Curated annotation (Swiss-Prot):
Biased composition (Polar residues): 691-705, 735-747, 828-847, 914-942
GO molecular function, one term: microtubule binding
Encoding gene per record: stu1
Disulfide-bond pairs as recorded: none
Name assigned to this protein: Protein stu1
Species name: Aspergillus fumigatus (strain ATCC MYA-4609 / CBS 101355 / FGSC A1100 / Af293)
Amino acid sequence: MMEVKAAELVAALKNSNMSVDTKVAHLQCVKSDIKQKNVPEGAVPSIFESIRLAIASQHSSLSGAGFSTLGHFLKRLLIQELHHLVALQCRALYPLLVERLGDHKERIRAQAAQSFTDMWLAAPEEVEQCVLGQALVGKNPRAKEMSMIWLSNVSSSFNIGGFSSFLTIALQMTKNYGLLFRSYVSSLVACLEDADSNVRNTAKNTVIELFENASERAKSDLKRQMATHNVRKSFVNAILASIDHGTSDMDAASRPISRAEALVHRPVSRAETQASRSVSRLDTHQRPASRMELAQSSVLHTEALPPRPVSVLSSRSETHKEVTKEVIGVERPKSRLTTAKSEPNWAVVSHTGPAEELPLPSSRPASQEGEKIDALYVSSSRQVDELFRDMMPHFEGRESEDNWIRREKDVLTLRRLTHGNAPDDYSPAYLAGLKTLLDGIFKVVNSLRTTLSTIGCLLIQDIAKRCGPRIDSMVEIMMQNLIKLCSGMKKISAQNGNATVDALIENVTFTTRILQHVSGACQDKNVQLRLFAAGWLKTLIQKQSHHKSSIEHGGGLDMMEKSVKKCLADANPGVREAMRSTFWTYYRVWPNRANEILSNLDPKSRSLLEKDPANPNAHQSAPKDSGPSRKGLANGTSSLAGRSALKEAIAAQKKARLAPAKAVPPPRPESAQSALSDKHSSAPSSSKSSVRTVPTGTSLSSLSSAPVRPAAKPRRPELNRPATADPYAARRSVATDSSTRHGNQIDGSPSAAKSKSSTPSLKSVSSTGSRDRADPVGTTRDRPKRLVISKTRSHDTHTRQHSKPIPTHSRKNSNESIPRHSPLRSEFSVTPISPNSVSLETPSTPRSHLVQDHGNLIAIASPPTHIQRTPIEPDASAEDPREHAAKATPVAIFEDTTPARSDHDDIQDAAMTLTENQTPQPSKVHSDSPIVSNKRVSNQDESVPHLTTGLGFLTGVGSVVEASELPNSDAQTDQSLFADHSLPVTHQPDSVTDSSKPSGLSSSLMVAGSPIRVANNENEIVIDSKTTHVSLPHRSSPKHNVLGELTSNEPSQRANKQIRHAANKLEDEVTTPIDDHSRHRWKKVEIADRRTSISPRSKDPTKAQQMLDKGIQRIRTKTMDILGYRKLQGIIKYHDSIFTNEEKYDEMLLALLDELESSPDDKRQPLGRPLDLKTQVLLTIRLMLIHNKIYFSAYCSRALGALVLARKYYDANCHIVSGLEETADDIIALCEPAAVIDSVLDVIITEEKDDREYRSILMGVSVLTRILSRLNADKCRVPELPLDRLGQFAASKLADRQPDVRRLAVQLCVQLHGMVANEEEYWRVLGHPRENSRNLLTYYILKK
């Protein structure tokens, strides 16, 4: 019968669907049978297995019932003399019981120790090996402590009981230190120097108990072992003194009582006899302490040793404590956790003396933390309760003149009690009393009396250091009150609160709530609180440095990183300085995350951080002007030379501004200037000015991180122009010319670039550009530069997006040009001019070329050009420039349709179409052509497009062509035609100009992405009469219009919505749903792409086929640019039968998929951003899908894999992510589910678990969920689906560290439920997840 019950019990315990109460009832039923009946041998294995399952349970009721059943079961088997079965079956329980010895609950640890005690009767060697050979030498401090207590209890309890002669002999061997115990003496003595204070004190007490009656030989062996392990002196003296006094227990118990009464009560009685004498209260309170010192010196036989700097909870004078306890005869506490932090003075509460007879403390204690506190010892929990009960009335109500002194005395009494034995020997009563008085204690802490508040804070510190994790339940209310205290205005109280919070964090158990408090303090508006929080965070990192998982798994690492970033960029320098030390502590624990923070700092902050004394790599980094400061850290630059140079530049500028204006002769005619160009070029070359980018708001130097203050009177210096070029030059004042010349020589601002007139000749343009860039490249970093702050918001926006210093080119670099056969001149690499490459000059600034200086634009004066035939009124220059800009002026966009000379130029012609909003591409001067070639520079994500005031044409290869160089360009234009810099470019319908004026050009402004083909001959420009007009509408005020970023393919009429910055955390990168703003941007990209038109040559099927072959080859070699992809899209849309066979389609599609899943490369593309290039790749793939779904269906799995892999390169707010999601939806609707699921699983299973790879995992799980959702919606079950593989993957992601992955995994499991026949099969497919995961899935399945 019992065999059947045992089998049913095992089945019930293994059934995860059965409730805990039912399992406990089954176990109790079997335990009742064990207590009443003999156990058959056939039922023994089943009962042992059921007990193992019960003890391993996480439910306290079930594990407790298991321990209880084990105790009765072992006794029954020993009564039946089945020792061999016990020894055999208990081997499966040993590892579990050793683990339970280190449990955080004391009750579980005690039950595990008792189980080992019961098993010891049947298998002593195995039990001792588990307890003393494994737990005692392990890493768990609780297990060590419990194993020593078990050893002491076994040695004492069984000698009293005397169950059998065998047991008595065995224990006598242990007590006499025979062979059974001698092998564990070394491990026991090693625990005397353990890192945990509780283990040290327990080891000391255990050694004393075991060696009390030992032989001299055993004591000598003990001394030798302690010397070998270098045990601290205080422990050695206390142990030796205790085992020496333990020879006659009866004497030690009878003698010291009278001595104790004489020694303890004598000072009190003398104080009472002197009570009638009128003395000060302070004298009365201090007399008992002096008598106690005299009494102590007469009782103690050894001098007090100075305390060693050990851990917070370690004892300081254990010798005096142990000797006094034996002398007074107080019963030794049964707990081993005696960690009294006592000083040479103490008092003992007698059993009969009331609380009122205690020596009164000093009314004005010192506020120092290192003051000496007289430890107060109690002998029962009843006395602890009485002490707290007597204190309760003093803390009621508000603080007054009557109760504050009593509160002060009570708090000091609590400190003495905390330093005594109450927290260890009578911990429940002590902690319960603290909870009742906690409200009153914080009334003292928050008192306006500084002394009272100080002793309250010291009490909290003592409690934290003494009790440690035992006050975890009170930490929340303590942190709230102490942080409030730290934010107060009183410096002493705030400092005390800071020290108290630090002690609390250091000693209690770490929880996420503590980190939330610290993180909140880091972001508080109170500067003092943020300053303290930096130290708290450092303490927290140091405390948890060996337990990083407790911070990482709870989301605390992100919270900590956010706090560090916040304080490193704090407005207060003190907070920044305090957080630098904390940062390097953070760096030692999480170096990779710290490097990310360091790399995102500005140069000045990074330099100060690297120079901090706490930097562990400070000895490795030498001060350099440039280059990386150390391996693994971000590159840093020295700003010392830059600061001095900046000061010199400011002084020189001020001196020039205060200098009197000198008259200068009018500029010479153009012919004269050309003849004397060599002479005049020497002066600007010797100056320290540098020509820089026209958008003057750009941050061009890292000399100072502070904003540059604009001059008191902003000036716009004029460019020096020939007198023959401007009929109104006489109106310009002499003072203006003088200030212009001085500004050119000193500040080097872009608007003050001095150059001579540019003529159509090659030499003039080249010499002008090189003359302004005569300084070497190496001297640019430390050269002072003046930042001209513009009034428009466009400049301010642009300022925040460039932070790198701009080095200048020497003369020899100015002659560089792009080779004639470089990729820039290939079929699919025609570079359009971006809006950012045009000038933002003032209305009075002369017309100029746009020239690139190492990736930045400079203004070079151009000769007067005549574009319009409409004459200008004589007083037109005196009018407001905005009146001219208000007139809608058409802009001519030309497309060359003449036959080309080669296939090379044919495709180039076809690629020149009108597009808008291209990514910025500045220009660069070269010497062999008047056309300014393009050199690709790095792009910012939010660049601001600008307009130009120069009247040159921007060509298809990024060039500027003077209007005077064009044939028949004799029309005049208004000087201030494009004076309004904030006017956006709007797209108007195409129109054809008058054929009678083929060369009449209305403007030189080019829309980005609208190239004009220029022949290789430098004097030949082929421009067709067909034009596209873009008008400039009038705006009321240019100050309120900010030109924001427009991505490629986006129409000019953009939505006026704030740009959402890319988030750095993975939590924001949820795959579905994509935010509406990103979807809106993607729709605009697709709509703009549909407007792409093709040239007549591309309409020829034969030519189109040739272009397609060349395009495929360029995609494979990764030399295709944005315009090439648009050309391919136009060809595919126009020719329905462009793919004559499936092989050509497959070749094209595979090349596109390979390009899509490759990493974006900034350096590879000469045109546009990598994001824009990948957008065109994705649009081409979508077009291939729409063009022929039958051909595409064979590559559904390959395409989905490429989409999932490509997802990891983009943030969630990139518009291309919306395109990836929509393309995946289209493929899901077309594909076969079984093959696609395997392909997606193959991709995401191999991904690494870092932040970038999680993007692919998120999208992959989302794709799988949508596939199953589609099948469930159609109510069809596909037998070929890899359900087992899906279930295994979903179950593994239910416990992932990323919450978004867990959320999507739950959705996948819910959809998977609809594909499985029944519940049992469903849980089998998921691998029988844990109970909490099962409950969560059940909830969502039922909710569905």
